[in-house]
């Protein structure tokens, strides 16, 4: 019999009389023996079909496996359960009593005030229900549901603002309710478990669109594929043709991934008294002489304002703001509208400990890509087939990358 072990130093022919290749085989007492079987890595299961696995070890020794399925995004920590870290696409507040139950069924119709953007099969978490609806308990409603249909059963034209879920208990009466503080947090659109080859018959729900028209194939109605990498201890995941998401390992497996545009790009302590308010206005001007690098529409969180300025309280200034205009000449500054009551005088202040924390934003950061990778040496996150700066359409030939060691900084700079 051939000697135990594999001999691959030469070609298959030069290894004649030895074992050259094997699969799931070990050598025991000089003889080849197949493995005895498989054991489950984790006792629990995940939802959907896994299309991407990525494992890594943190500096602290934690062993993780990232799992991207056609339905969700998970992370597993050293044989523990799979933690659902699927990003939230949007969170909407419902109008008063917009949850409708029908006697004898577990199907509940929920209406949003604006378009929800969901597709059949998506997951949504309902919170804030303060009373039973048709006999369905509060705890049964305040949980994560899978959307089974869009629209109202009696009006299929309401697909953009209504959706249906199946609760774990049936209603004992027909009623509408929920209260005035109900929110619906929609996870990112789910994808298909199969490849769609064309845009013809059967690619959209029954009755969708006009007769004979084709249906566009996007990330929600095509085979769901992921690319997953680790950025140091953290994980970055990209839905093919979709957004790029970031999961921060330091916050734990109970926190979901967020869009790359929502991570912190820069946090800086500003010079003394950087905040100016104008009499009879809610517009504030904040000086960041170090150069903010922001554009209109970006968000910044201000903290550390020590007292009221021009009649506007510190609590109204120490908030997240949306930038309304920018001035890039020195000293650089930006403005934001904080709403509420106007300032009673023009004044400058804030103290010496004001901090501005900028999010990466959607202008420079890619919001759609085909794939992401990372350069191991300089640690650039590289987006392949992504949107251009300031745009939304995917350019299959465009390759962009972030600054070294800075996954939230994508602004191209001259060197």
Roles of regions detected by a PLM:
Residues 49, 69-71, 143, 231, ...:
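Generic hydrophobic, aliphatic-rich segments that mediate packing or membrane embedding
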Residues 69, 77-79, 239-241, 249-251:
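Short acidic-glycine loop/turn motifs at beta-strand connectors
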């Amino acid at each position: 019999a051939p000697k135990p072990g594999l001999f691959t130093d030469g070609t298959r022919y030069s290894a004649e009389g030895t074992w050259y290749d094997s699969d799931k085989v070990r050598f025991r007492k000089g003889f080849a023996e197949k493995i005895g079987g498989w054991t489950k890595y984790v006792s629990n299961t995940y939802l959907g079909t896994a299309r991407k696995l990525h494992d890594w070890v943190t500096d602290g020794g934690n062993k993780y496996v990232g799992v991207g399925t056609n339905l969700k995004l998970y992370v597993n920590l050293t044989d523990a359960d799979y933690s659902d870290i699927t990003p939230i696409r949007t969170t909407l507040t419902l109008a008063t009593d917009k949850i409708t139950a029908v006697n004898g069924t577990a199907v509940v119709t929920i209406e949003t005030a604006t378009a929800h953007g969901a597709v059949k099969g998506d997951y949504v978490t309902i919170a804030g229900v303060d009373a039973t609806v048709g006999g369905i308990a509060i705890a049964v409603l305040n949980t994560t549901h899978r959307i089974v249909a869009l629209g109202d059963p009696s009006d299929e034209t309401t697909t953009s603002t209504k959706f249906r879920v199946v609760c774990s208990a049936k209603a004992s009466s027909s009623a509408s309710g929920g209260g005035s503080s109900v929110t619906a947090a929609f996870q990112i659109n789910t994808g298909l478990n199969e490849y769609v080859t064309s845009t013809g018959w059967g690619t959209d729900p029954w009755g969708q669109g006009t007769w004979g028209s084709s249906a566009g194939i996007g990330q929600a109605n095509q085979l769901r594929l992921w690319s997953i990498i680790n950025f140091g201890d953290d994980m970055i995941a990209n839905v093919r043709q979709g957004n790029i998401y970031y999961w921060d390992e330091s916050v734990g497996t109970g926190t979901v991934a967020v869009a790359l545009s929502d991570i912190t790009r820069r946090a800086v302590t500003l010079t003394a008294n950087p905040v100016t308010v104008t009499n009879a206005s809610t517009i504030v001007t904040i000086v960041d002489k170090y150069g903010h690098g922001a554009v209109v529409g970006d968000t910044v969180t201000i903290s550390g304002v020590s007292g009221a300025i021009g009649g506007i309280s510190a609590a109204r200034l120490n908030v997240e703001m949306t930038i309304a205009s920018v001035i890039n000449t020195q000293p650089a500054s930006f403005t934001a509208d904080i709403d509420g009551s106007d300032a009673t005088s023009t004044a400058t202040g804030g103290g010496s400990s004001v901090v501005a924390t900028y999010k990466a934003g959607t202008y420079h950061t890619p919001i759609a890509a085909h794939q992401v990778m990372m350069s191991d040496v300089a640690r650039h996150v590289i987006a392949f087939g992504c949107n251009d700066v300031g745009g939304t359409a995917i350019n299959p030939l465009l390759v962009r990358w972030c600054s070294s060691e800075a996954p939230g900084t994508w602004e191209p700079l001259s060197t």
